[in-house]
């Protein structure tokens, strides 16, 4: 420790800029034994408005267990375009491959994200086009929802607005990360 103690805190799957989440995991070390309810109360007292503590628990899985993330994505389109966009979305997932340019620290690579992306559901309503997807996530392979949207918008026009909500973080067996 010395004169400058270091904080141990990690976010196993940090959110990308512009993505919301129902629940986020954070792993941190305490320097003394504390009741979980006290930890939750003390954290909640110093969080910014709009943030809350859902649960405090001992870690069950290592961060390396994360394999998937599920998202709810809403794309705003005018009413007259929604059915065509729904058709285009289903067509994208009917393809055997979905090639995108993925940017990494080593440069850009052409990547087929189709084996690592599943369309769970989709629909249109008065708010636009909705899709629920499962994408590979974690330390070995991470497919961002923005990459999927780039692939979708290659052959369509950009949405008037986009809302991305991460709804779950899952392990390889698709069990909730804990």
Predicted features and spans:
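Short beta-strand-to-loop capping motifs
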Residues: 28-34, 73-79, 133-137
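Extended, solvent-exposed, turn-rich assembly/linker loops in the middle of proteins
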Residues: 26, 37-47, 55, 72
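Short amphipathic alpha-helices in soluble, non-transmembrane regions
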Residues: 38-47, 84-94, 147-149
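A generic structural signal for short beta-strands and their flanking turns/coil linkers
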Residues: 5-7, 22-26, 49, 67-69, ...
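Internal, conserved structured core segments that host functional sites
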Residues: 51-94
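Short, charge-patterned binding micro-sites
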Residues: 2-31, 60-63
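Core RNA-modification/binding signature centered on pseudouridine synthases
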Residues: 95-178
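Short amphipathic beta-strand starts and helix->beta connectors
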Residues: 6-15, 50-59, 110-123
């Amino acid at each position: 420790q010395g004169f400058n103690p270091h904080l141990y805190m990690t976010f196993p799957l940090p959110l990308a800029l512009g993505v919301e989440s129902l629940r986020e995991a954070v792993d941190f070390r305490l320097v003394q034994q504390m009741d979980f309810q006290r930890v939750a109360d003390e954290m909640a007292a110093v969080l910014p408005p709009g943030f809350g503590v859902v649960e405090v628990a001992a870690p069950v899985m290592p961060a390396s267990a994360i394999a998937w993330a599920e998202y709810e994505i809403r794309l705003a389109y005018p009413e007259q375009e929604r059915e065509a966009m729904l058709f285009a979305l289903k067509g994208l997932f009917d393809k055997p491959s979905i090639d995108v340019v993925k940017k990494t620290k080593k440069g850009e690579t052409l990547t087929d994200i189709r084996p690592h992306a599943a369309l769970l559901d989709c629909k249109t309503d008065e708010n636009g086009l909705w899709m629920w997807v499962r994408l590979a996530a974690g330390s070995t392979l991470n497919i961002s929802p923005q990459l999927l949207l780039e692939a979708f918008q290659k052959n369509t026009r950009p949405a008037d607005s986009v809302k991305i909500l991460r709804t779950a973080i899952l392990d390889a067996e698709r069990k909730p990360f804990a």
